[in-house]
């Protein structure tokens, strides 16, 4: 008889408990309750999708949002759009809704669809969100408005961003706000309006208006800015003052009282020097705000050596120098007045541009530069919508320099290659024009075909069709020959390119050939002069060629710039109307002259 033994309860439960414990250990890590969806993705889309598919509810939405962000980061926009549509059907928290909107907006931002971005990105003001999300929101909207050239609206978003920004970010935002306001004209600024609750934005606008309206009086501008900042110490502009405003506040405003004019009044360049001197004195005598005690010392640079000139500057207590004119003397200026043992530090406006311009806060440069004019022509042609320019210039180093200047500027705006041709002997002019327009090649191809086929073909040479604008650097006598040759070289059924010319063609003499339709550049004094200035100049100098007027205008602008250069150095984008153009400076203090353009009428 089999004896059955009873098993005790403790002995039965022990292996069961062990099995449960082992099962718990093998079930893997516990899923998190939530994911910080404001962070940047660190995994692939697939990894985030695996985690999303193994969860549910709000946590699944978190993983789907991270998968969406990973897809956008990898530029997988189709995948991202599918995930965005999937999320649109879910119940999202405020933080998730914000991140979903930011994801949609990021796709539009990457594709340059700024208007669409602004429509999609609209947080509710009552949402309780982390600061980082509000910062992303306002910054993305600011960038979108910037892309739409709506700088004021961009500033509105940047001011809102400032509520959540760190000190370092505040400083950067302040500079950006100030730069945006700098893109507006005085008239545009005064027409901008803020809302009643936009005190910070309104403060920035007030400062910008002051900077524009008082830019012609740096002393008054400095005093006004100092007073406003002291009255508004808690405004971001007072705490995180942009560098441009700091430069104005730190400026020691001293108007030159003893000016020296250095020119070669004898020798080869004497005629040009005397015309510049006459223009300078003309402007000085017409300056109603001139200090009666101010002095002018005119020094002939051919009558004294560098050491003698330096000593005269010291003896006369000169505090500003205009000149010299000759390039080699301009290069000596750095060593003569560099503030070292070689000489005193005296601010100067040189009347030529050396080959190698070195940044120097004390020396600026003004010249009637053909290279500057050619570069400006390239910019003008592009802004007018022309895509395939041809430049015609004289053979030799001068023509090569202006062509290179045109090319260099054109490359800033377009990858299209500039066609270039050089002309020389007038007897070869028609052949040169035919070659550049492809007429010679066309004739050769026709001749080859006739030779091969041994029959006379009824055809005519075809000119190239890829040139839509021609810029010509030529004298008026050369231009009168070039224009008809171009017209003959163009096929009757092709659209003729627009012809532009430099000021070199505007001699002021009588024109006996038809130059109708040619658009040319020149200084404002010759294209759009002030009638009162013209009348007074005609009274003083009855007969003046255009070249003589340009040199006098250079002297007039040299005088004007003595008072304007301090503003130009500290106010970005500052410009002033002059007789040789709209004047501004670049980073090397080379004066840039924006010329005027006009079209020649019929004879």
Curated annotation (Swiss-Prot):
Record's keyword annotation contains Lipoprotein: yes
Lipidation (N-palmitoyl cysteine): 25
GO molecular function: enzyme regulator activity
The keyword Transport appears for this protein: no
Signal sequence residues: 1-24
Main location: membrane
Gene3D superfamilies: 1.25.40.650, 3.40.50.2300, Tetratricopeptide repeat domain (1.25.40.10)
Keywords: Cell outer membrane, Cell shape, Lipoprotein, Membrane, Palmitate, Peptidoglycan synthesis, Signal
Gene Ontology CC terms, in alphabetical order: periplasmic side of cell outer membrane
InterPro entries reported for this sequence: LpoA, Peripla_BP_I, TPR-like_helical_dom_sf
Chain residues carrying a lipid of type S-diacylglycerol cysteine: 25
Subcellular location: Cell outer membrane
Lineage top rank: taxon: Bacteria
Pfam short name (any one): LppC
Biological process according to GO: peptidoglycan biosynthetic process; regulation of cell shape
Membrane topology: Lipid-anchor
Subunit structure and binding partners: Interacts with PBP1a.
HAMAP family given in the database record: LpoA
Protein family according to the UniProt entry: Belongs to the LpoA family.
Functional summary from the UniProt entry: Regulator of peptidoglycan synthesis that is essential for the function of penicillin-binding protein 1A (PBP1a).
Official protein name in the record: Penicillin-binding protein activator LpoA
């Amino acid at each position: 008889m089999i004896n059955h033994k009873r098993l005790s309860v403790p002995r039965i439960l022990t292996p069961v408990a062990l099995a449960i414990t082992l099962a718990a250990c093998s079930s893997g890590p516990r899923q998190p309750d939530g994911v910080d969806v404001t962070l940047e993705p660190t995994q692939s889309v697939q990894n985030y999708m695996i985690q999303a598919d193994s969860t549910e509810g709000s946590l699944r939405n978190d993983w789907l949002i991270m998968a969406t962000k990973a897809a956008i980061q990898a530029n997988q926009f189709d995948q991202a759009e599918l995930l965005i549509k999937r999320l649109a059907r879910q119940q999202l928290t405020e933080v998730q809704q914000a991140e979903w909107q930011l994801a949609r907006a990021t796709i539009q931002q990457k594709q340059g669809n700024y208007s669409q971005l602004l429509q999609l990105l609209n947080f509710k003001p009552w949402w309780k969100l982390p600061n980082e999300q509000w910062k992303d929101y306002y910054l993305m909207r600011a960038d979108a408005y910037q892309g739409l050239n709506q700088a004021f609206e961009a500033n509105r978003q940047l001011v809102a961003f400032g509520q959540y920004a760190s000190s370092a970010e505040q400083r950067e935002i302040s500079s950006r706000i100030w730069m945006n306001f700098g893109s507006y004209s005085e008239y545009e600024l005064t027409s901008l309006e803020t809302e009643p609750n936009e005190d910070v934005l309104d403060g920035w606008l007030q400062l910008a208006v002051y900077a524009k309206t008082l830019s012609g009086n740096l002393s008054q501008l400095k005093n006004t800015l100092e007073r406003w900042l002291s009255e508004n110490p808690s405004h971001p502009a007072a705490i995180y003052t942009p560098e441009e405003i700091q430069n104005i506040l730190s400026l020691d405003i001293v108007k030159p009282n003893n000016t020296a004019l250095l020119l070669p009044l004898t020798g080869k360049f004497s005629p040009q020097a005397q015309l510049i001197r006459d223009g300078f004195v003309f402007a000085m005598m017409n300056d109603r705000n001139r200090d009666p005690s101010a002095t002018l010392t005119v020094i002939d640079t051919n009558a004294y050596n560098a050491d003698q000139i330096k000593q005269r500057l010291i003896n006369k207590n000169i505090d500003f120098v205009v000149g010299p004119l000759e390039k080699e003397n301009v290069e000596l200026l750095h060593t003569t007045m560099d503030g070292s043992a070689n000489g005193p530090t005296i601010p100067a406006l040189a009347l030529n541009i050396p080959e190698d311009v070195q940044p120097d806060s004390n020396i600026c440069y003004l010249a009637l530069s053909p290279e500057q004019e050619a570069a400006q022509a390239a910019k003008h042609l592009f802004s007018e919508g022309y895509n395939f320019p041809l430049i015609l210039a004289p053979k030799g180093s001068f023509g090569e320099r202006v062509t290179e200047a045109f090319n260099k500027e054109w490359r800033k705006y377009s990858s299209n290659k500039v066609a270039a041709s050089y002309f020389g002997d007038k007897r070869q002019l028609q052949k040169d024009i035919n070659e550049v327009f492809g007429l010679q090649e066309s004739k050769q191809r026709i001749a080859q075909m006739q030779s091969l086929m041994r029959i006379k073909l009824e055809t005519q040479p075809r000119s190239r069709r890829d040139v839509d604008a021609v810029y010509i650097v030529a004298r008026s006598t050369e231009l009168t020959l070039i224009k008809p040759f171009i017209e003959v070289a163009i096929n009757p059924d092709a659209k003729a390119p627009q012809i532009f010319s430099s000021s070199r063609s505007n001699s002021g003499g009588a024109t006996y050939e038809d130059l109708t339709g040619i658009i040319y550049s020149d200084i404002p004094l010759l294209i759009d002069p002030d009638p009162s200035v013209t009348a007074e100049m005609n009274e003083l100098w009855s007969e003046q060629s255009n070249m003589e007027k340009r040199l006098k205008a250079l002297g007039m602008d040299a005088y004007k710039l003595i008072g304007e250069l301090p503003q130009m150095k500290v106010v970005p984008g500052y410009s002033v109307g002059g007789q040789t153009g709209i004047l501004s400076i670049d980073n090397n203090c080379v004066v840039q002259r924006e010329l005027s353009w006009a079209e020649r009428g019929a004879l």
